[in-house]
Structure formats: C-alpha cells, structure tokens
C-alpha cells in the first residue's frame, strides 16, 4: 500500500461526471477513508478503494479539505466486494463493508504501522512486528445504542448518516454488528410502541446490553459477565458492571485481550499501578503478577464495583480509588512504589498530569491499551527516549467493519 505521503504530485484538476465529482483515490488513510487530491483540494472518501475511479457526493468541507461518499464506481477495484448491509455506505456506523474482513485487517495494520513510523522515526525507535488479534466480525457487540426520532409521524430508529444527525433506519434484518438477541430486542420494542402497549419513548436514544442471551437496559441495570481465560492455566473469572458503566464491547475478544495483557506483563512485580481501571477486570485477570495492586478511576460507582469484583474472584490484596486523572495528581508515594503501570485511557489519551507523572517517575515498564491509535502513538512519542524500548505492538480488532480498533503496546527499560 502507498503511504499518505506518496503520490501528491499525481493530483489533477477536478472533473465533473453526471453532476458529481470524479475522483481517483490513491491511498488508505485513518478513520476508514481513502484519499484523493486535485491541484488545490484534498478529498477523504468513504466507500472508495485506492486505484478506483469514483463519482463522489461531497458531504462536508473545511477550507481545502473535503469529505464525501463514493456513490458510483466507474473503475472497480478487484478488492471490492458487494456490501452485505443494505444501508451501507449511508449509515455512519461501518467503514469497510466494501472490502473483505481480511483486507480490512490488512488496512488497519497498515494505518497503525504508518502512524507509528510518522511519530517515532525521528526518535529512532525500533518498531516491532505488529501482531493482530481478531474474531468473528459479525454479531460481536455486547452493548449498543440506537438513535430515535420522527419524520412527521414516522418513527425513525437506527444510526446517524455519515456527517449528519439524520437517522438511517436499521435494516429489517437488523445490524450485522449486533447479536440477533439485541436486534430482536430493538425490533420488539419498536413493534410494541407501534401497537401502543409501550409508551412512546421521549428519549433520543435506546440502549441495551447483552448478558449471556438476555438483553437488558444499559442505563438502568447492572450486568454480570463471566469468561474462561488462560492465565496461564484455564480459569473462570466473573465480574459485574454497574448500570451505564464502561465495558469492552466485543464479546468474542475479551478473553484473548486479557490473555495478551497477561502474557505481556512481567511476573513478580512489587506493585502494579492501573490507571483508568474501570470495574477492575484487568486486576482480576492479572492479580497473580503482583503482591499489591492499585487502581484509579474517575467513576465512584465503578470503583465500588471493582472492589466487589475482586472479592467475587477471591482476591483481597487489590485497592481501588476514585480520582479524576484529568485534573488531579496521583499520590507520589504510591506511584513510586509501583514497578509496572497499566493504562487504558479514553480516546483522548493520557492527561497531561498522567503523562508528566509517567515521565518523572520512569517505571520499569508499562502497558498501554487504547481504542485510538493516534493519541496512543502521540503519547508514546512524548515519553519514549534512549532509556526505553517499544517491545510489543498488538492490534486488537474490537470493532470489525468500523473505522476503530484497539491497540496494546508494551514499553520497558532497556537492559
């Protein structure tokens, strides 16, 4: 694949075909787009494969940057496949239903590699071969939220259109990313609403979570999960998440993700510090790595749940505290006594305070898991120096067919 930096000189004048712009994208770029150029403009295209010639409907502009969707394909790539979803590419949820899943993984690996090289090459940081963890690309989500609205008297229920707050109704067969139980629950709710047996929902969203085969309200009820994981021997772990609490959404990859983290974290740590610890899932899986575990999380409900979760698994030597990592400093004594860090921040990445503390403290190593590879690599570029090496990069495709993916990296001090 060509990198984003290649091919700029091949730009040309804009051509109009049947009232639409005719473009030839040259490379894949982040967020599920391919990129095309004219003499003065840059175009980010959905539903277009590099090398194709496509008629494009423009949806958004910012200066000389344009975003659009390929509506007709004039020259078709051999990599294109028919979409298995009737509302792609209108729906803003998925980005890769016009290529095979294997090709999607190849694209995501290419984008991650390019981002790593862009940020780290000037520091002469050696980048290890990227590993990939993936599972079934269909029916994987254990949590979902659909948008609700009306067009006149007609009920709308689905996902937002690309670059819009217009709702694209779910197909009759439901969303490919959702389990059948969840698709049925959404359809049944709307059917009962039409019949009048359910009050018309005034909320703009409807959210569910899957507990086994049972669908429950995301915001109103806590949920229990269990998994068999090899850490290293096979063990069954259980955990609960409070109503509205965060959880990894791919039900097929939670165990492989935890097993990979277990593999990467060194044994016999005096203390592990976990930031953005959620409801304590990683601590449950990795407690054998250390005699002491300290986790920080902004949500007091999640902290209380984390304390209950470790007890559910017979673990007593873990401590969890409520702390806003965006605005508050971590207690220095506790940090200095932690030989290894684990961080799983939101998409925005590490806060300035966390990053400054990490640089100042210089632990023996850390593991960073993120659903935004650009902020992850940005943070790495600010921390990595001659004393540290990047020893593992693993792409975990938590979000098949969409523009997102998870990345785990391990950083450790050089010998």
UniProtKB/Swiss-Prot annotation:
Gene3D superfamilies: 2.40.50.1070, Nucleic acid-binding proteins, Vaccinia Virus protein VP39. One of its GO terms (molecular function) is 4 iron, 4 sulfur cluster binding. It is an enzyme of class 2 (transferase). InterPro entries: MeTrfase_TrmA_AS, NA-bd_OB-fold, SAM-dependent_MTases_sf, U5_MeTrfase_fam. S-adenosyl-L-methionine binds at residues 248, 276, 297, 344. Its EC number is 2.1.1.-. [4Fe-4S] cluster binds at residues 85, 91, 94, 175. The active site is at 371 (nucleophile). The keyword Translocase does not apply. Keywords: 4Fe-4S, Iron, Iron-sulfur, Metal-binding, Methyltransferase, S-adenosyl-L-methionine, Transferase. It comes from the Bacteria. The keyword RNA-binding does not apply. One of its GO terms (biological process) is rRNA base methylation. PANTHER family: RNA M5U METHYLTRANSFERASE, TRNA (URACIL(54)-C(5))-METHYLTRANSFERASE. Belongs to the class I-like SAM-binding methyltransferase superfamily. RNA M5U methyltransferase family. This is Uncharacterized RNA methyltransferase LA_0098. It comes from Leptospira interrogans serogroup Icterohaemorrhagiae serovar Lai (strain 56601).
């Amino acid at each position: 694949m060509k990198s984003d930096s290649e091919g700029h000189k091949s730009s040309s004048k804009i051509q109009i075909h049947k009232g639409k712009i005719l473009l030839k994208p040259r490379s894949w770029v982040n967020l599920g787009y391919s990129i095309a150029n004219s003499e003065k403009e840059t175009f980010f295209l959905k539903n277009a494969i590099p090398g194709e010639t496509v008629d494009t409907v423009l949806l958004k502009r910012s200066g000389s940057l344009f975003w659009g969707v390929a509506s007709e394909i004039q020259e078709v790539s051999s990599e294109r496949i028919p979409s298995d979803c009737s509302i792609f590419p209108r729906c803003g949820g998925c980005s890769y239903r016009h290529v095979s899943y294997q090709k999607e993984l190849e694209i995501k690996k290419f984008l991650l590699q390019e981002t790593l090289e862009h940020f780290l090459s000037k520091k002469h940081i050696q980048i290890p071969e990227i590993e990939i963890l993936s599972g079934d690309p269909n029916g994987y989500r254990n949590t979902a939220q659909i948008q609700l609205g009306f067009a006149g008297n007609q009920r709308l229920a689905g996902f937002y259109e690309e670059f819009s707050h217009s709702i694209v109704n779910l197909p009759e067969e439901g969303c490919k990313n959702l389990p059948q139980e969840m698709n049925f629950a959404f359809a049944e709710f709307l059917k009962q609403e039409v019949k009048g047996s359910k009050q018309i929902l005034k909320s703009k969203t409807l959210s569910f979570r899957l507990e086994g085969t049972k669908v429950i309200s995301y915001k109103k009820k806590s949920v229990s999960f269990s998994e068999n994981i090899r850490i290293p021997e096979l063990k069954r772990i259980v955990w609960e998440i409070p109503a509205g609490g965060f959880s990894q959404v791919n039900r097929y990859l939670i165990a492989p993700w935890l097993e990979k983290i277990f593999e990467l974290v060194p044994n016999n740590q005096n203390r592990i510090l976990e930031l953005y610890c959620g409801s304590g899932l990683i601590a449950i899986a990795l407690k054998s790595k250390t005699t002491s575990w300290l986790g920080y999380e902004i949500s007091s409900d999640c902290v209380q749940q984390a304390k209950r979760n470790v007890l559910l698994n017979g673990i007593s030597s873990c401590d969890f505290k409520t702390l806003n990592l965006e605005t508050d400093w971590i207690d220095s004594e506790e940090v200095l006594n932690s030989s290894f860090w684990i961080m799983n921040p939101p998409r925005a990445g590490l806060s300035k305070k966390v990053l400054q503390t990490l640089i100042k403290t210089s632990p023996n190593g850390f593991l960073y898991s993120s659903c935004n590879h650009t902020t992850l690599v940005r943070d790495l570029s600010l921390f990595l120096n001659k004393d540290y090496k990047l020893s593992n990069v693993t792409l975990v495709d938590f979000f098949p067919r969409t523009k997102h993916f998870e990345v785990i990296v391990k950083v450790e001090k050089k010998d």
